[in-house]
Amino acid sequence: MKFQYKEDHPFEYRKKEGEKIRKKYPDRVPVIVEKAPKARVPDLDKRKYLVPSDLTVGQFYFLIRKRIHLRPEDALFFFVNNTIPPTSATMGQLYEDNREEDYFLYVAYSDESVYGK
């Protein structure tokens, strides 16, 4: 997926910012969250998040669901590198395994469980 954040900010800027954030907040991880193309869910009011490393993916789902005002019966799926992460994983684990060279973790969200549909 093409992330708008990457389009808006050159790599060097993102990397410098990511390094600065990691130094200043070593117990938190910088995450970029954007809606997947063709997803039929609302847009987020912001796309950059600084989340505690020990927050689980499941807890992060809850936060994002709240921000986009999803009803309990509405589906929401996260994709990290085109894969749905386990809800029991911590954001810190997910970050360590999937962060990009600019020190950000990129997460796409959708109402479909198949990426890009």
Curated annotation (Swiss-Prot):
Post-translational modification: The precursor molecule is cleaved by ATG4 (ATG4A, ATG4B, ATG4C or ATG4D) to expose the glycine at the C-terminus and form the cytosolic form, GABARAPL1-I. The processed form is then activated by APG7L/ATG7, transferred to ATG3 and conjugated to phosphatidylethanolamine (PE) phospholipid to form the membrane-bound form, GABARAPL1-II. During non-canonical autophagy, the processed form is conjugated to phosphatidylserine (PS) phospholipid. ATG4 proteins also mediate the delipidation of PE-conjugated forms required for GABARAPL1 recycling when autophagosomes fuse with lysosomes.
Lipid-anchored residues (Phosphatidylethanolamine amidated glycine): G116
Domain of life: Eukaryota
One family name in Pfam for this protein: ATG8
Ranges annotated as spanning the membrane: none
Organism: Pongo abelii
Family: Belongs to the ATG8 family.
Function: Ubiquitin-like modifier that increases cell-surface expression of kappa-type opioid receptor through facilitating anterograde intracellular trafficking of the receptor. Involved in formation of autophagosomal vacuoles. While LC3s are involved in elongation of the phagophore membrane, the GABARAP/GATE-16 subfamily is essential for a later stage in autophagosome maturation.
Pro-sequence residue ranges: 117
Gene for this chain: GABARAPL1
Membrane topology according to the record: Lipid-anchor
Covalent lipidation (Phosphatidylserine amidated glycine), chain numbering: G116
UniProt keyword annotations, A-Z: Autophagy, Cytoplasm, Cytoplasmic vesicle, Cytoskeleton, Endoplasmic reticulum, Golgi apparatus, Lipoprotein, Membrane, Microtubule
GO BP annotations listed: autophagy
Chain positions of site Cleavage: G116, K117
Full protein name: Gamma-aminobutyric acid receptor-associated protein-like 1
Any single Gene Ontology cellular-component annotation: microtubule
UniProt-annotated location(s): Cytoplasmic vesicle, Autophagosome; Cytoplasmic vesicle membrane; Cytoplasm, Cytoskeleton; Endoplasmic reticulum
